[in-house]
């Protein structure tokens, strides 16, 4: 009897553990175009939200240069067609606090051809009964390159150690959803790609849930002074992104 109880306990623990890791798995395919810099890119992302609060995603980003699916030009080595940009892994563990509140620590790791980025974060949520959802996140961005970013005083290069703040306002009405995400990034006296030590980004997104787990969406993005014109001055860039999510 004792052996049976032990076996039953082990099997129950295994089943509970397995059920906890079950959840929703989705694939997200997105294409984007920056209007002022005339850049094309895409991203494919696989996400899993487990029932126990654990979230995991992997994604691969590609640059498409002059065309979305152009090949490399053998006579022009600068025209590389479709090229790999980066791979990203995100993990977080969400804890429900009750009354619509939740919090999650997490980590984003980005792999590029030249270095690896580490981005630990803490994120919180508040869901309301009227369909409104609020979320806020603080993220610390660093990289394994001691000379990754340019100092504004002209003294040289230093390691990226920037502070990033995001807020999401999301609202759902039936199958229709919309969101607004302002983002702010700062590192004292270090160029954020804007000619300044600050960076702002604003994203407005709309989505619509179709049958069989399909959800198309569009994102309209303002990128703070990341485009450098012919005179060497920084100007805002703008992006249009079209994507679709399929829940498996």
Language model: regions and residue ranges:
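Repeated loop/turn-to-beta-strand initiation elements of outer-membrane beta-barrel proteins
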Residues: 24-27, 52-58, 96-105, 130-136, ...
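Cleavable N-terminal export/targeting peptides
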Residues: 1-26, 248
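Transmembrane beta-strands of outer-membrane beta-barrel pores
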Residues: 31-35, 60-66, 107-113, 138-144, ...
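Residue-level signature of outer-membrane beta-barrel architecture
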Residues: 48-50, 93-95, 124-126, 169-173, ...
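Detector for outer-membrane/organellar transmembrane beta-barrel domains
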Residues: 117-191, 200
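Outer-membrane beta-barrel "beta-signal"
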Residues: 208, 235-248
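Short glycine/proline- and aromatic-enriched beta-strand/turn motifs that initiate or cap beta-hairpins
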Residues: 20-74, 86
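Residues that define the transmembrane beta-barrel architecture of outer-membrane proteins
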Residues: 38-42, 46, 83-89, 116-120, ...
């Amino acid at each position: 009897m004792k052996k049976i109880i032990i076996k039953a306990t082990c099997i129950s623990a295994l089943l509970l553990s397995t059920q906890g890791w079950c959840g929703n798995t989705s694939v997200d395919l997105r294409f984007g175009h920056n209007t002022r810099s005339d850049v094309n890119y895409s991203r494919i992302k696989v996400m899993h939200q487990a029932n126990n609060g654990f979230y995991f995603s992997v994604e691969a980003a590609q640059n498409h240069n002059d065309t979305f699916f152009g090949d490399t030009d053998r006579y022009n080595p600068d025209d590389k067609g479709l090229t790999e940009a980066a791979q990203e892994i995100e993990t977080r563990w969400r804890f429900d606090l009750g009354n619509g509140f939740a919090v999650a620590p997490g980590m984003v790791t980005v792999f590029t051809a030249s270095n690896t980025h580490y981005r630990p974060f803490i994120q919180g949520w508040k869901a309301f009964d009227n369909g409104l959802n609020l979320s806020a996140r603080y993220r610390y961005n660093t990289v394994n390159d001691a000379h990754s970013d340019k100092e504004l005083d002209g003294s040289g290069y230093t390691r990226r150690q920037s502070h990033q703040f995001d807020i999401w306002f999301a609202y759902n009405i039936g199958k229709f959803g919309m969101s607004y995400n302002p983002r702010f990034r700062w590192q004292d006296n270090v160029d954020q790609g804007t000619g300044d030590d600050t960076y702002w980004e604003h994203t407005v997104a709309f989505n619509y849930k179709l049958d069989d787990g399909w959800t198309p969406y569009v994102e309209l993005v303002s990128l703070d002074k990341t485009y450098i014109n012919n005179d060497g001055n920084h100007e805002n860039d703008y992006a249009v992104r079209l994507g679709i999510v399929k829940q498996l």
